[in-house]
C-alpha cells in the first residue's frame, strides 16, 4: 500500500525530486508570471554621478524617455553603490508595455551626449535571456542570405537614344512612357490604381512617388519596383529635399495610433507633419501644423473664412544641411540635419515676419570666405515702423542686408536659380489705398555690400514674375485695375527685361527690352536651359494662346535694343483649347501643353511641341489628369567638356539628323515588312484553302476546279471609246413653304 502524504518522510520527498526530471517540461510549458514587468525597461550606458547630481541626471534623461512614451520622475529608479555613486544604469517604468517596446526600438543606441550612448532593453528580456542556459555558449555563425542585385535606379539615363520619360495619370491608371517625338509614346509600365491623389518625381528623377491613404510609396528601377514606404495616415501633401535625402509629408488630420507603434511612434501622435530620412525610411522628427492667418470673409470676418494651409511647411537650404519653418508673425525656426536639432537651440525672432525663401544655390559673396547659406525674409509695416526686407546668413544668423519699404500691400521674394539675385516684388498702395502699383527691388547678392537696384518704371500691378534659369533676364506680366463684377478677363501686358552690356562683361542695370500690350497671358514658363520662354493663357474659358519666344534670336537686332543682352523674337503662337498646364522636358527641347480633368472635362489631353512652337503630336485622353516629365540629375561633364560640346554642336547635329532619318527609314521599313508578312500569310492561307477544296471535290467525284482565264483584250480594243450616258427621271415634285 502506498504511503499517504502525511506519512511521507523527508527522504521520500528528496528521492521523488531526484528520480523525476521536469526540466524539459518546464522549458516547454513554463508560464511566465511577470506581474506587470512588461512596462519596465533597463537603461545602461548612463554617466556615473554622485547622489546630489542624480535628480539633475534624471530630469535630463526624462526628456529623452518621453519622446517615445510617457513616464515620470518617480518611475525612474537609479540605484547607488556603497560610495554614494550611481551604477551607470536605471530602471524605468512606462505607462504601457507598447511604450516600453517603442523605447527599446527608438532609444537603443542613441547618444545621450558626446561620451555616453544609451543601451535600452526590456526588463523581461534581460530576465529571459540572462538565465543560465538560455544563450548558447558556442558561437553559431549567422546564415548569410545570398546577394541579390538591386535595380539600377538611374537606368533610364543609359537610353541609347537619350530619350526622356514622363509619367501620365489618367482615369485610374498611371503609366510611365518614353517620349517618341512625333510618334505615339512608348509604354514602360502601366498600372491600375497606382495612386489615389497624384504622382510626383523626386528632384533628380530617381524615384516616382505615389500618394495613398496609408502614406507615400516610392518606386524606381527599370520596372518601377517598390523602393521605400513612408506610413502617414491620410497624407495629402509631400515634398522632397533638393538632393533627395529627405521627404516631408503633411496631413490635415493629426496622427492617431490605434495599435502598438510600428514605423510611427508615440512621438508622432497628434502631429500633422513628418520629416523622413529617405535612406533609412525612418522619421527624423514630427511637428504640428502652423496655420496661416485666414483671409477676411465677405463681411470682414476672418474667423469665418477658411484657414489657409502653410505649404511648403518646411523649406530646405541648397546644401540640405538646414531646414526651416516659419511661425507667422513671430519667428523662423532653423533645424540642423540630420539630427533635426534647433540651430543654437533657439528660433530667430522676427516680429511680424510674413514669408521667407532660401537661396536655391550656395552663394559665394564677395569678401566672404566661410561657407554660408542665405535666406531672405520680409516684414510688414508695424505702427510707425516701415516694412522691411532682409537677407540673413546661416548658420551665423547675421542679417547682412536690409531694405526699408513704405506703403506696402504685399511682397513676393523671387530668387534667381544660381542665387546671384533676389528680386523683391513690392505691391504698393497709394495714400488713399484705392490703387496699386508694383516696383522691383533687385538685390545683387554676389557684389560687394549687396547693392540694390530699383525698377520703378512699372505703372500697373505685376501678377507674374519669372527669372531666366541660369541667366540674368526676367519676364513679368502686368495688369491694370479690374472693375468689380466684370466677367471678361482683364487685358495684360508682357514685359521682357535684360541687363545692359558693359565693357567688363558684368551684368549692367536692368532695362526694359520690349512690352507686348493687349494680351490675356497669365503664365510664364522658361526653358530649364534658359533662352526660350513660353508665355501662355491658362485656366481661361475664352483665350488659349501659347506664345513661344526666343531671347537670343540670331537675326538682325533692333537699333534701340543694341545695348541690351537680348534679341527678342516671337517664333510662333499656338492655341490649345482649355489648356491648364505647360511643362518643359528637362532638356529644353520639348514642351507639353495639357488640359486636365482636375480643372474641366472638355477635350482633356495633351499636345507636344518643339521649343520653337512646332506641334508634333496631339493626344486626346479621356479623364486625363496629369503629365509630369522625369527630371535629370546635373551633368557630370566639366565646364571645359561642355564648352567642347557647344563648339562641335554642328557636327553632332548632322549625326543626330542622320539618326532621325535612319529612324524614319526603319519605321517605313517596318511598315513594308509588316505588309509583306500579311500578304504572305494571306497567300499561304489561300493556297491551303484551295488544296482543301480540291480534296473535297475529289472525294465527291467532282471534276477538278478550273479557274476561268482572265479575259484577253480584243484586237483594237485600245482604240475603242466608252461613252456613258446618265439619264435623270423626276418621279415626284412637291413644294413646301417654310415660315
UniProtKB/Swiss-Prot annotation:
Residues 39-125 form the RRM domain. Gene3D superfamilies: 3.30.70.330, YVTN repeat-like/Quinoprotein amine dehydrogenase. The keyword Plastid does not apply. Keywords: Cytoplasm, Initiation factor, Protein biosynthesis, Repeat, RNA-binding, WD repeat. GO terms for biological process: formation of cytoplasmic translation initiation complex. SMART domains: RRM. InterPro entries: EIF3B (IPR011400), eIF3B_RRM (IPR034363), Nucleotide-bd_a/b_plait_sf (IPR012677), RBD_domain_sf (IPR035979), RRM_dom (IPR000504), TIF_beta_prop-like (IPR013979), WD40/YVTN_repeat-like_dom_sf (IPR015943). GO terms for molecular function: RNA binding; translation initiation factor activity; translation initiation factor binding. The keyword Repeat applies. One of its GO terms (cellular component) is eukaryotic 48S preinitiation complex. It is found in: Cytoplasm. WD repeats lie at residues 191-229, 231-288, 457-498, 516-559, 574-612. Its main location: cytoplasm. Pfam families: eIF2A, RRM_1. It comes from the Eukaryota. Belongs to the eIF-3 subunit B family. RNA-binding component of the eukaryotic translation initiation factor 3 (eIF-3) complex, which is involved in protein synthesis of a specialized repertoire of mRNAs and, together with other initiation factors, stimulates binding of mRNA and methionyl-tRNAi to the 40S ribosome. The eIF-3 complex specifically targets and initiates translation of a subset of mRNAs involved in cell proliferation. Component of the eukaryotic translation initiation factor 3 (eIF-3) complex. This is Eukaryotic translation initiation factor 3 subunit B.
Amino acid at each position: 500500500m502506498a504511503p499517504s502524504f502525511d506519512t511521507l518522510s523527508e527522504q521520500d520527498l528528496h528521492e521523488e525530486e531526484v528520480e523525476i526530471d521536469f526540466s524539459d517540461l518546464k522549458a516547454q510549458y513554463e508560464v511566465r508570471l511577470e506581474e506587470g514587468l512588461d512596462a519596465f525597461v533597463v537603461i545602461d550606458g548612463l554617466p556615473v554621478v554622485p547622489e546630489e547630481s542624480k535628480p539633475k541626471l534624471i530630469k535630463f534623461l526624462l526628456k529623452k524617455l518621453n519622446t517615445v512614451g510617457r513616464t515620470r520622475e518617480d518611475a525612474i529608479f537609479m540605484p547607488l553603490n556603497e560610495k554614494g555613486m550611481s551604477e551607470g544604469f536605471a530602471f524605468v517604468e512606462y505607462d504601457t508595455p507598447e511604450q516600453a517596446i517603442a523605447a527599446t526600438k527608438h532609444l537603443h543606441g542613441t547618444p545621450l551626449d558626446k561620451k555616453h550612448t544609451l543601451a535600452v532593453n526590456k526588463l523581461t528580456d534581460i530576465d529571459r535571456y540572462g538565465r543560465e542556459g538560455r544563450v548558447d555558449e558556442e558561437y553559431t555563425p549567422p546564415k548569410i542570405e545570398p546577394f541579390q542585385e538591386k535595380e539600377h535606379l538611374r537606368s533610364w539615363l543609359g537610353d541609347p537614344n537619350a530619350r526622356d520619360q514622363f509619367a501620365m495619370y489618367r482615369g485610374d491608371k498611371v503609366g510611365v512612357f518614353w517620349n517618341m517625338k512625333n510618334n505615339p509614346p512608348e509604354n514602360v509600365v502601366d498600372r491600375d490604381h497606382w495612386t489615389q491623389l497624384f504622382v510626383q518625381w523626386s528632384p533628380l528623377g530617381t524615384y516616382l512617388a505615389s500618394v495613398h491613404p496609408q502614406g507615400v510609396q516610392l518606386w524606381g528601377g527599370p520596372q518601377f519596383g517598390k523602393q521605400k514606404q513612408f506610413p502617414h495616415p491620410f497624407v495629402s501633401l509631400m515634398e522632397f529635399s533638393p538632393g533627395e535625402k529627405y521627404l516631408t509629408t503633411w496631413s490635415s488630420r493629426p496622427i492617431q495610433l490605434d495599435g502598438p507603434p510600428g514605423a510611427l511612434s508615440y512621438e508622432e501622435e497628434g502631429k500633422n507633419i513628418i520629416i523622413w530620412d529617405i535612406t533609412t525610411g525612418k522619421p527624423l522628427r514630427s511637428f504640428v501644423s502652423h496655420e496661416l492667418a485666414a483671409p477676411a470673409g465677405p463681411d470682414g470676418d476672418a474667423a469665418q473664412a477658411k484657414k489657409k494651409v502653410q505649404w511648403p511647411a518646411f523649406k530646405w537650404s541648397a546644401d540640405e544641411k538646414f531646414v526651416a519653418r516659419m511661425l507667422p508673425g513671430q519667428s523662423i525656426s532653423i533645424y540642423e540635419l540630420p539630427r533635426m536639432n534647433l540651430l543654437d537651440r533657439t528660433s530667430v525672432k522676427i516680429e511680424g515676419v510674413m514669408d521667407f525663401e532660401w537661396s536655391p544655390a550656395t552663394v559665394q559673396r564677395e569678401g566672404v570666405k566661410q561657407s554660408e547659406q542665405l535666406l531672405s525674409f520680409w516684414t510688414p509695416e508695424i505702427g510707425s515702423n516701415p516694412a522691411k526686407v532682409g537677407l540673413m546668413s546661416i548658420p551665423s544668423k547675421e542679417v547682412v542686408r536690409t531694405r526699408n519699404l513704405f506703403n506696402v500691400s504685399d511682397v513676393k521674394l523671387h530668387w534667381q536659380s544660381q542665387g546671384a539675385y533676389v528680386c523683391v516684388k513690392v505691391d504698393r498702395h497709394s495714400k488713399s489705398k484705392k490703387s496699386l502699383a508694383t516696383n522691383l527691388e533687385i538685390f545683387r547678392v554676389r557684389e560687394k555690400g549687396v547693392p540694390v537696384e530699383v525698377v520703378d518704371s512699372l505703372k500697373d500691378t505685376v501678377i507674374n514674375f519669372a527669372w531666366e534659369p541660369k541667366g540674368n533676364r526676367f519676364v513679368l506680366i502686368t495688369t491694370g485695375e479690374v472693375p468689380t463684377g466684370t466677367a471678361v478677363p482683364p487685358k495684360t501686358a508682357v514685359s521682357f527685361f535684360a541687363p545692359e552690356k558693359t565693357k567688363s562683361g558684368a551684368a549692367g542695370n536692368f532695362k526694359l527690352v520690349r512690352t507686348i500690350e493687349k494680351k490675356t497671358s497669365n503664365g510664364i514658363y522658361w526653358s530649364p536651359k534658359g533662352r526660350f520662354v513660353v508665355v501662355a493663357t491658362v485656366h481661361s474659358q475664352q483665350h488659349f494662346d501659347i506664345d513661344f519666344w526666343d531671347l537670343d534670336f540670331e537675326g538682325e537686332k533692333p537699333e534701340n535694343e543694341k545695348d541690351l543682352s537680348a534679341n527678342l523674337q516671337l517664333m510662333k503662337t499656338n492655341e490649345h483649347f482649355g489648356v491648364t498646364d505647360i511643362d518643359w522636358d528637362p532638356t529644353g527641347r520639348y514642351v507639353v501643353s495639357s488640359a486636365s480633368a482636375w480643372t474641366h472635362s472638355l477635350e482633356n489631353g495633351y499636345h507636344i511641341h518643339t521649343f520653337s512652337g512646332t506641334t508634333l503630336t496631339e493626344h486626346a485622353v479621356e479623364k486625363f489628369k496629369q503629365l509630369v516629365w522625369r527630371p535629370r540629375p546635373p551633368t557630370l561633364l566639366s565646364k571645359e567638356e561642355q564648352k567642347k560640346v557647344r563648339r562641335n554642336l554642328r557636327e553632332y547635329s548632322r549625326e543626330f539628323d542622320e539618326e532621325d532619318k535612319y529612324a524614319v527609314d526603319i519605321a517605313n521599313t517596318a511598315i513594308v515588312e509588316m505588309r509583306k508578312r500579311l500578304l504572305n500569310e494571306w497567300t499561304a492561307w489561300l493556297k491551303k484553302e484551295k488544296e482543301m477544296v480540291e480534296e473535297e471535290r475529289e472525294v465527291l467525284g467532282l471534276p477538278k476546279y478550273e479557274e476561268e482565264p482572265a479575259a484577253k483584250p480584243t484586237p483594237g480594243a485600245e482604240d475603242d471609246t466608252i461613252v456613258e450616258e446618265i439619264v435623270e427621271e423626276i418621279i415626284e415634285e412637291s413644294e413646301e413653304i417654310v415660315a
